[in-house]
Swiss-Prot record:
Identification of the protein by name: Galectin-related protein
GO molecular function annotation: carbohydrate binding
Domain of life the protein comes from: Eukaryota
Membrane spanning residue stretches: none
Gene3D superfamilies membership: 2.60.120.200
Domain Galectin: 38-170
PANTHER family noted in UniProt: GALECTIN, GALECTIN-RELATED PROTEIN
Key words, A-Z: Lectin
Gene name as annotated: lgalsl
Listed Pfam families: Gal-bind_lectin
Purpose of the protein: Does not bind lactose, and may not bind carbohydrates.
Length: 171
């Protein structure tokens, strides 16, 4: 979906004040056309330390996988850099993550204390941007940190979600 299409159809979600013990309150602003999957939406102002992204949804009844990507735009040719791809694989009970910068995938990370997603059940994913890393929480529990591979955080301005889930809220 072209960036201009996303912006022209965009609705502004209510702005919420979020705070962190490490930062002052920040505004979480995500613009999106509709909460349909596959989904592509614009992150106003890009990522920055203190910014948080909230994804709420329900896993499908018989899921194979789903993925959440934060990207530097939505270009297909050349492909936009992928700051993080979170991929939930249900057969192997893995939550994989990686980044693709200048067309090259980095080393995939897979270690997690447990697999947090259950078929036909709701979930809440929070992505907290900090200076050296993204902190990923699922249902209120921190699962892992993913250290930035894209240097310019403000360039990370698009969220893409695809796979076996229904979105209920994005903020």
């Amino acid at each position: 979906m072209a960036g201009s299409l996303v912006e022209s159809e965009a609705l502004q979600m209510g702005v919420r004040r979020l705070s962190s013990p490490l930062t002052s309150p920040v505004q979480a602003e995500v613009y999106f056309p509709r909460l349909t999957v596959p989904f592509c939406g614009h992150i106003k102002g890009g990522m920055r330390p203190g910014k948080k992204i909230l994804i709420m949804g329900i896993v499908n009844l018989e899921p194979k996988s789903f993925d959440i990507r934060l990207t530097c735009g939505d270009s297909e040719d050349p492909a936009a850099d992928i700051a993080i791809e979170l991929r939930a694989e249900f057969a192997d009970k893995q939550l994989l993550r990686n980044a693709c910068v200048s067309g090259k995938w980095g080393e995939e990370e897979s270690a997690i204390p447990y697999f947090p997603f259950i078929a036909d059940q709701p979930f809440r994913v929070e992505i907290h941007c900090e200076h050296p890393r993204l902190r990923i929480f699922v249902d209120g529990h921190q699962l892992f940190d993913f250290y930035h591979r894209v240097e310019t955080l403000s360039a990370i301005n698009t969220i893409k979600i695809n796979g076996d889930l229904q979105l209920t809220k994005l903020g």
